[in-house]
């Protein structure tokens, strides 16, 4: 059992590498092809759209072939696509590759969470927050390695090839995973509409992912232009969010076993609201950084709890409920920053963060769904 747990942690770590390198490639592509912000926004939409579009199909693939095989296939394809992204010769080719990469990463995300859910069920203990902590550690580690490599004169293509090599090395342990996760679909049943509980889980996940997208894209802008911090210092807002998210996930399973999953969910949503209130209502850059860190610590365990609950929805097969919840969450990450931008353009960025806080408040009342 320990071997399966550690290998599950490894594949979550690998997924963290995949999403971070994707994010790091983007600004270099913007510079290489002289893309404006509007054009870049449309290009980025391709990745998120691909991810959301493929998730229902990914659930069926997991049910048919097992998450272990799906992880192997999608991780191998990711290793091929990463160097291709770094070497894309034109914006059009990059957009097409990003759509494929987003679709493949969406399928990988469904597969690793399905594997996490079945390993958790086999162990009889909560592990999903710990798995997602490994994902967060993968993002932090790859960001640090990328920063060092690029600072020493490495190219984006070299970074992509190196990252693909690390993922390939991790795949050598894939045989230790559970071969079959998820129940096989009844004959002819390839799609099912989400039931009420799945929709509640999905909407809570939307709020959690919207928060992540908002802090990723807008925290530095808020601290720079609303709080007057220097541009390099303004990035501390997202750094605090990311580090505290990882810290929350490292302790989340023990808290959930001690206090209960709904209690941890409510505490997380409440801390997220408090963090946004602190950042918006106190006119201080340092306090803003603390506020975004509090948001990360509060919301860090929401997605793991929701994904774990999605695998246990009564009356709905896991290969239907899990992709539905993950897809709705991804929609929050994709559309949330856009919504923040639209509200900000009319009412200010502080008010826009208030919208996010309201959604977290609604998630507070949906916490019973994770029991």
Where does each model-flagged region fall?
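Helix-breaking motifs and short loop linkers at transmembrane-helix boundaries and internal kinks
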Residues: 34, 66, 87-92, 228, ...
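Conserved MFS/SLC helix-loop-helix module at the cytosolic interface between two early adjacent transmembrane helices
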Residues: 53-92
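Helix-to-loop junctions at the C-terminal end of transmembrane segments
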Residues: 54-67, 150, 248-260, 344
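Structural signature of the two symmetry-related core transmembrane helices
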Residues: 69-83, 263-278
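Intracellular juxtamembrane helix-capping segments at the cytosolic ends
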Residues: 106-122, 301-314
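Helix-loop-helix hairpin linking two adjacent transmembrane segments in secondary transporters
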Residues: 130-178
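Symmetry-related core transmembrane helices of the 12-TM Major Facilitator Superfamily/SLC fold
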Residues: 157-174, 351-369
């Amino acid at each position: 059992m320990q071997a399966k747990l550690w290998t599950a942690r490894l594949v979550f770590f690998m997924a963290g590498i995949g999403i971070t390198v994707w994010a790091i490639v983007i600004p270099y592509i913007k510079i290489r092809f002289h893309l404006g912000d509007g054009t870049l926004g449309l290009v980025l939409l391709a990745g998120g759209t691909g991810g959301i579009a493929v998730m229902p199909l990914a659930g069926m693939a997991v049910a048919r072939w097992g998450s272990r095989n799906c992880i192997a296939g999608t991780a191998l394809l990711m290793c091929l696509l990463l160097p291709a992204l770094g070497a894309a010769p034109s914006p059009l080719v990059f957009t097409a590759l990003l759509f494929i990469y987003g679709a493949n990463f969406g399928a990988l995300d469904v597969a690793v969470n399905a594997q996490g859910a079945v390993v958790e069920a086999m162990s009889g203990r909560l592990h999903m927050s710990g798995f997602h902590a490994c994902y967060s550690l993968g993002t932090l580690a790859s960001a640090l390695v990328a920063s060092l490599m690029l600072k020493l004169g490495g190219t984006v293509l070299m970074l992509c090839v190196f990252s693909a090599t690390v993922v390939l090395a991790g795949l050598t342990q894939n045989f230790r995973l559970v071969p079959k996760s998820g129940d096989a679909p009844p004959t002819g049943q390839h799609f099912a509409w989400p039931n009420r509980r799945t929709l509640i889980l999905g909407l809570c996940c939307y709020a959690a992912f919207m928060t992540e997208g908002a802090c990723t894209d807008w925290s530095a802008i808020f601290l720079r232009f609303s709080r007057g911090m220097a541009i390099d210092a303004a990035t501390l807002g997202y750094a605090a969010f990311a580090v505290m998210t990882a810290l929350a996930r490292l302790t989340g399973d023990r808290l959930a076993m001690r206090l209960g999953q709904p209690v941890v969910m409510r505490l997380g949503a409440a801390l997220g609201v408090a963090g946004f209130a602190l950042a918006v209502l106190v006119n201080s850059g340092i306090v803003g950084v603390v506020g975004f860190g509090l948001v990360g610590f509060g919301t860090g365990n929401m997605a793991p709890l929701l994904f774990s609950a999605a695998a246990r929805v009564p009356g709905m097969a896991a290969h239907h409920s899990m992709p539905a919840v993950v897809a709705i969450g991804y929609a929050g990450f994709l559309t949330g920053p856009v919504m923040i931008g639209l509200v900000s353009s009319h009412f200010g960025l502080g008010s826009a963060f208030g919208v996010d806080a309201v959604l977290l408040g609604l998630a507070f009342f949906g916490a019973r769904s994770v029991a």
